[in-house]
Amino acid sequence: MQIIPESPEVDLDKLLEKVKEVIKDYGEYYKHEVEPLAFGLKSLIVYFLIPETSFNEEQFLDNIKQIEEVSDAEILMATRA
């Protein structure tokens, strides 16, 4: 999943902790990476494991986007275990 913060000033470590709290309600955090976008803005690429049978992607993304510092979020890829 790619998460784009509202501005370059957003503390990505604190944002990641908030994202992990949302992920906990659905599954398990795996790892993350930070990718530069433009003009000093960086995005979080977050990997997580969620049981396929209980996953509601729309609701999950809505919960991520409700985090104050999040400008946008999208799932980039999904695979089956």
Curated annotation (Swiss-Prot):
Keywords noted in UniProt: Elongation factor, Protein biosynthesis
SMART domains assigned: EF1_GNE (SM00888)
The encoding gene: ef1b
Protein name (record): Elongation factor 1-beta
Biological role stated in the UniProt entry: Promotes the exchange of GDP for GTP in EF-1-alpha/GDP, thus allowing the regeneration of EF-1-alpha/GTP that could then be used to form the ternary complex EF-1-alpha/GTP/AAtRNA.
Record-level Gene Ontology MF annotations: translation elongation factor activity
Organism: Nanoarchaeum equitans (strain Kin4-M)
InterPro entries according to UniProt: eEF-1beta-like_sf, EF1B_bsu/dsu_GNE, Transl_elong_EF1B/ribsomal_bS6, Transl_elong_EF1B_B_arc
Pfam families: EF1_GNE (PF00736)
Organism superkingdom: Archaea
SUPFAM superfamilies assigned to the protein according to its UniProt record, in alphabetical order: eEF-1beta-like
Family to which this protein belongs: Belongs to the EF-1-beta/EF-1-delta family.
